[in-house]
């Protein structure tokens, strides 16, 4: 049976309109013919507020959309054609899955009658993203034109329900379209405005049970992992209330979103944990969210003999890679704090907290001395200096690998609150620049701190510059590639370390930036960093790059020297 191209457009428009009525505000569109009806529909709906961005690389587009979602927690849709285009969405879907971020992946497909018969660009794409997605949803096998508006509304409701549930995450909508695909718009009426729809009930974790065996009157430690959806004002208020009740010190990951807030945080715990036997004795640990990056912290938690309770925010999946937690509550910190008996911190808890804070203060003073704004650039010194020199109104994204680890160990306290972003879910370096561009598009400004290999891995991320309405500033730490492997216990003497692990590249980041019309500047000495950052943050350009050249072998030695210091010897015993 033949169909009219307008029928495909009608169905695509009805689906996108239904998604908009449920809260979808933006779409990232990749090129393709089979996805033509969705492209035309998205274009027609721009007049009703749909923000449309286009990108030629599906992998990059997936990460750009994920960056937008990370910025405000609202779902973003990506539209692609059929075939390998779908496979390129998998890295972003994996990160969205681990980070619990809502992402709608709309992929055009051939009708069922063209499957498994050798038809061009017809693959088993419905299976490609399924392991990483909350749900696989499909339209009619004959084509989306065969769906009524009511069925398309139910499809949209199901997609949003899965994407925004507990946990939030990516949803794959695989949509078959039959030919003809491209309608003539000249005789068609304008798209109707989307009708507001009530979002169906979201998936929620099971109810909160009785109070787990943590005693607020005994000494304890609070460990806060990287930011997740739900770590907003209610979470912070509950943490402040918990601290007033227990007095427990708070060991907060650099990307927890807490540094700079009025909380008694311990930022230098990674270095202080070099001598765990010197720590004030704790009877229990409360872990909030996923695991921080610090390996020393993980080792300490793995050998800790007291109870460890894990509390997550609408995340029912297990968040205990060390298998050391006694239980996990997925309903959030605020609900758990409400169950605590009233009271005040014990004298022992107050004394222990004071000792933690004293050690933290002395450690930060010593790091100021050990990592001055002098001499050649080093990665530990850069982490500390960037924290202090970048104005707090500029959010910072830390690329996976060395930057996030150095910021965790050496950046120290923040004088004012700053949003720090990292993607520690799958810890991939693919999509780094595109992620940052998506965040900058929503927040209007962002500083990305990245290594040279992570930047090179997402070279197509430069292409977002032309459509970027915000300001993205790149600090590229060029250490000749693979500096993170210098920090791992790899026996270098018995192998070709550079060839097998570091994999240094010859691509010039500044030349690559220039090829895309991006202004770039070089920094090789700490003395010039403040002036270089002032240039970097000047308004006007969509993107700018500052390259900081470092020596990864020398930096590896510096890190080890700092990690081996007896930090607790500077702190008087109680």
UniProtKB/Swiss-Prot annotation:
Entry's Gene Ontology BP terms: menaquinone biosynthetic process; phylloquinone biosynthetic process
InterPro entries from the UniProt entry: MenaQ_synth_MenD (IPR004433), MenD_middle (IPR032264), THDP-binding (IPR029061), Thiamin_PyroP_enz_TPP-bd_dom (IPR012001)
Keyword Manganese found: yes
One GO molecular-function entry: thiamine pyrophosphate binding
Database matches in CDD domains: TPP_PYR_MenD (cd07037), TPP_SHCHC_synthase (cd02009)
Description of how the protein assembles with itself and partners: Homodimer.
Function summary: Catalyzes the thiamine diphosphate-dependent decarboxylation of 2-oxoglutarate and the subsequent addition of the resulting succinic semialdehyde-thiamine pyrophosphate anion to isochorismate to yield 2-succinyl-5-enolpyruvyl-6-hydroxy-3-cyclohexene-1-carboxylate (SEPHCHC).
Annotated protein name in UniProt: 2-succinyl-5-enolpyruvyl-6-hydroxy-3-cyclohexene-1-carboxylate synthase
Lineage, top ranks: Bacteria, Bacillati, Cyanobacteriota, Cyanophyceae, Synechococcales
